Amino acid sequence: MDKLHLEIVTPQGQVFSDDVSSVVLPGSEGEFGVLPNHASLISLLKAGIIDIEDKNKNHDIVAINWGYAKIDEGKVVILADGAVYVAGNSESELANSLDQAKRLIESMSSDTNAFAATIAKMENVVRAR
């Protein structure tokens, strides 16, 4: 099976690094998916969520305010100005990281419809856990 390695890095450090099945990125021209063996690409990313699917078909999400994606030879590297990995071992930790993610995206998004759609998608992924 072909592998796809994802790394998400901010000026504060690494937020995520693991092998994944696929990833959906918030490109400047719209969302796009990346699978193993994707063509090489560099893209500007807008404020939104990165939807990460692991080999067990579970989804994780990382909210970013903006950044760049470099896709090359089975590896996706995201350089983001700010990122929040929405995760937690308890309901309160998960709710806290979700609130941080909402604030991060809201601080960068001037489009209220896009912001509402992004928040709804984030909440749906969290509920599905």
From Swiss-Prot:
<dbReference type="GO" id="GO:0005886">
    <property type="term" value="C:plasma membrane"/>
</dbReference>
<comment type="similarity">
    <text>Belongs to the ATPase epsilon chain family.</text>
</comment>
<keyword id="KW-0406">Ion transport</keyword>
<protein>
    <recommendedName>
        <fullName>ATP synthase epsilon chain</fullName>
    </recommendedName>
</protein>
<keyword id="KW-0066">ATP synthesis</keyword>
<keyword id="KW-0997">Cell inner membrane</keyword>
<dbReference type="InterPro" id="IPR036771">
    <property type="entry name" value="ATPsynth_dsu/esu_N"/>
</dbReference>
<keyword id="KW-0472">Membrane</keyword>
<dbReference type="Pfam" id="PF02823">
    <property type="entry name" value="ATP-synt_DE_N"/>
</dbReference>
<keyword id="KW-0813">Transport</keyword>
<dbReference type="GO" id="GO:0045259">
    <property type="term" value="C:proton-transporting ATP synthase complex"/>
</dbReference>
<keyword id="KW-1003">Cell membrane</keyword>
<dbReference type="InterPro" id="IPR020546">
    <property type="entry name" value="ATP_synth_F1_dsu/esu_N"/>
</dbReference>
<dbReference type="GO" id="GO:0046933">
    <property type="term" value="F:proton-transporting ATP synthase activity, rotational mechanism"/>
</dbReference>
<keyword id="KW-0139">CF(1)</keyword>
<comment type="function">
    <text>Produces ATP from ADP in the presence of a proton gradient across the membrane.</text>
</comment>
<keyword id="KW-0375">Hydrogen ion transport</keyword>
<dbReference type="InterPro" id="IPR001469">
    <property type="entry name" value="ATP_synth_F1_dsu/esu"/>
</dbReference>
<dbReference type="GO" id="GO:0005524">
    <property type="term" value="F:ATP binding"/>
</dbReference>
<comment type="subunit">
    <text>F-type ATPases have 2 components, CF(1) - the catalytic core - and CF(0) - the membrane proton channel. CF(1) has five subunits: alpha(3), beta(3), gamma(1), delta(1), epsilon(1). CF(0) has three main subunits: a, b and c.</text>
</comment>
